[in-house]
Curated annotation (Swiss-Prot):
Name of the protein this chain belongs to: Platelet-derived growth factor subunit A
Function description: Growth factor that plays an essential role in the regulation of embryonic development, cell proliferation, cell migration, survival and chemotaxis. Potent mitogen for cells of mesenchymal origin. Signaling is modulated by the formation of heterodimers with PDGFB.
Domain of life: Eukaryota
Gene Ontology molecular function terms on file: growth factor activity; platelet-derived growth factor receptor binding
Subunit structure: Homodimer; antiparallel disulfide-linked dimer. Heterodimer with PDGFB; antiparallel disulfide-linked dimer. The PDGFA homodimer interacts with PDGFRA homodimers, and with heterodimers formed by PDGFRA and PDGFRB. The heterodimer composed of PDGFA and PDGFB interacts with PDGFRA homodimers, and with heterodimers formed by PDGFRA and PDGFRB.
Signal peptide bounds: 1-22
Keywords associated with the record: Cleavage on pair of basic residues, Developmental protein, Disulfide bond, Glycoprotein, Growth factor, Mitogen, Secreted, Signal
UniProt xrefs under InterPro entries: Cystine-knot_cytokine (IPR029034), PD_growth_factor_CS (IPR023581), PDGF/VEGF_dom (IPR000072), PDGF_N (IPR006782)
CDD domains, sorted: PDGF
Length: 226
C-alpha cells in the first residue's frame, strides 16, 4: 500500500509541474521586427511595447514591506532590546541608457595610401583628425546604424619627406567623409544619399576616393598576321 501511495503522490506532483515545462519558446520573428522598428529609450518603453504588466527580477515592494513588518514584530517579541545599529543603505541601481544611433565625433586616422600609395618613406601631420560618424546600436541585430545623409569636405595635411638628407614638406588635400544623419537599416542596405551631389553612392567608392568609369569599352587590339 505504501508503494502505491508514493506512486499516486508522484503522479499528482508531475501533473502540477508539467504545465511549466516547455514554457520557454523561440522568439517570434514578428516580435523581433516590431522591436527593430520601434523607438525604445527605457525599460518602461520596452514593457509597454511588449504589453507586459510587470518586470521580472525584483520583488513586489508591498509584499516585501508586509513581510519585513511581520519579521520585525516577531523579532521584537522574542529577542531582547539591543542598541540600534545604523543599517547600510542599499545602493540604487540606475537603469541602463541605450547608446542610440546618431552622429558622434570619432577619431579618423588618415590612411597613408590616401596620401601617396607609391611611397612609404614619408610622414603625415596631423596623422589623425576628428570627424562625425554614425555610431550606436539598434534594438536588434537585424538592423545596423548606418548613415542616411553624408557630406564631404577637404582638409590640408602636411606630407614630410626626406630628400637628399634634407626634410621636404608638401601640402596634400585629403577628402573626409562626415555623416549628417543616421538611421537603423538592414545590414545589406549600405547605400546612402550624398549631400553634395544628391546621388546614391557606394561607401567602398567613397573611402578609396576612386570612381569607376562607365560607358567606355576597351577596344581589343587586332593582331597582324605574320
Amino acid at each position: 500500500m505504501r508503494i502505491w501511495a508514493w506512486i499516486l503522490l508522484l503522479s499528482v506532483c508531475c501533473s502540477y509541474l508539467s504545465p511549466s515545462l516547455g514554457e520557454e519558446a523561440e522568439i517570434p520573428q514578428e516580435l523581433i521586427e516590431r522591436l527593430a522598428h520601434s523607438e525604445i529609450r527605457s525599460i518602461s518603453d520596452l514593457q509597454r511595447l511588449l504589453d507586459i504588466d510587470s518586470v521580472g527580477g525584483g520583488e513586489d515592494a508591498s509584499a516585501a514591506n508586509i513581510r519585513s513588518q511581520k519579521h520585525d514584530f516577531h523579532h521584537n517579541r522574542l529577542v531582547p532590546e539591543k542598541r540600534s545599529v545604523p543599517s547600510r543603505r542599499k545602493r540604487s541601481v540606475e537603469e541602463a541608457v541605450p547608446a542610440i544611433c546618431k552622429t558622434r565625433t570619432v577619431i579618423y586616422e588618415i590612411p597613408r595610401s590616401q596620401i601617396d600609395p607609391t611611397s612609404a618613406n614619408f610622414l603625415i601631420w596631423p596623422p589623425c583628425v576628428e570627424v562625425k560618424r554614425c555610431t550606436g546600436c539598434c534594438n536588434t541585430s537585424s538592423v545596423k546604424c548606418q548613415p542616411s545623409r553624408i557630406h564631404h569636405r577637404s582638409v590640408k595635411v602636411a606630407k614630410v619627406e626626406y630628400v637628399r638628407k634634407k626634410p621636404k614638406l608638401k601640402e596634400v588635400l585629403v577628402r573626409l567623409e562626415e555623416h549628417l544623419e543616421c538611421t537603423c537599416t538592414a545590414n545589406s542596405n549600405s547605400d546612402y544619399r550624398e549631400e553634395e551631389t544628391g546621388f546614391f553612392t557606394s561607401p567602398a567608392l567613397v573611402l578609396t576616393g576612386r570612381t569607376r568609369e562607365t560607358g567606355k569599352k576597351q577596344k581589343r587590339k587586332k593582331l597582324k598576321p605574320t
